Curated annotation (Swiss-Prot):
CDD domains: REC_OmpR_CusR-like, trans_reg_C. The gene is czcR. Phosphorylated by CzcS. This is Transcriptional activator protein CzcR. Keywords: Activator, Cadmium, Cobalt, Cytoplasm, DNA-binding, Phosphoprotein, Plasmid, Transcription, Transcription regulation, Two-component regulatory system, Zinc.
């Protein structure tokens, strides 16, 4: 799961990045409204945590632009605690509103609630051939066989399944799963794919994850390796 945090206070941003990363999320940080909006438009986030009082472009303006194009869950995290501000946030399309100072455990619970609501609009499960992924329960099956994955392996498989049939470059995978752009000479993505295949593909007759030479990887039951 990938989270965008739009927060201009460095210590708060660092605290959120550390806590969310330790909770299994890939976290991107924007320290002003303009950068936050640009990142929200360029990347497919699972949830956005948005401050209101931001330099350049405030959070009210950011969410207006986001809602004109996307239904990505947005949680306001702000020091503005007036009822009028909360009402304004919800009227502009926020999924939740939490006032600073806050307890991280409550923030995490609210994020998970936003994710549950978002996935219920689509599907809490993804299924391709006999590969089944329970997004909220973070469980994976091929047929009746349960497959144990690490957090990174789950994020990688979730990405491939959401973008079924689309060839994803190593750069795209690295950015979406690890939140960084690896040097093209490194084989971090290749190693991760190989480990994922060893669990999801190798023990089974039908292979789902395929290499497209010179381009990247794709999850597609119709292709042959």
């Amino acid at each position: 799961m990938r989270v965008l945090v739009v927060e201009d206070e460095p210590r708060t941003a660092e605290y959120l990045q550390k806590g969310l990363s330790e909770s299994g999320f890939v976290v991107d940080i924007a320290n002003n409204g303009g950068d936050g909006l640009h990142m929200a438009e360029e990347t497919d986030y699972d949830v956005i945590i948005l401050d209101v009082m931001l330099p350049g472009m405030d959070g009210w303006t950011v969410i207006k632009s986001i809602r004109s194009k996307s239904e990505t869950p947005v949680l306001f995290l702000t020091a503005l605690d007036d009822v009028a501000d909360r009402v304004r946030g919800f009227e502009l399309g926020a999924d939740d509103y939490l006032v600073k100072p806050f307890a991280f455990a409550e923030l995490l619970a609210r994020i998970r609630r936003c994710l549950r609501q978002s996935t219920s609009k689509e599907s809490e499960r993804l299924r391709i051939a006999d590969l089944d992924i329970d997004v909220l329960g973070r469980r994976v099956f091929r047929g009746t066989t349960r497959i144990e994955l690490t957090n990174q392996e789950f994020s990688l498989l979730h990405l491939l399944m959401r973008r079924r049939g689309e060839v994803l470059s190593r750069t795209t995978i690295a950015s979406q799963v690890w939140g960084v752009n690896f040097d093209t000479d490194t084989n971090v993505v290749d190693v991760a794919i190989r480990r994922l295949r060893s669990k999801v593909d190798d023990p089974f007759d039908q292979k789902l994850i395929h290499t497209v030479r010179g381009m990247g990887y794709v999850l597609d039951p119709e292709r042959g390796r």
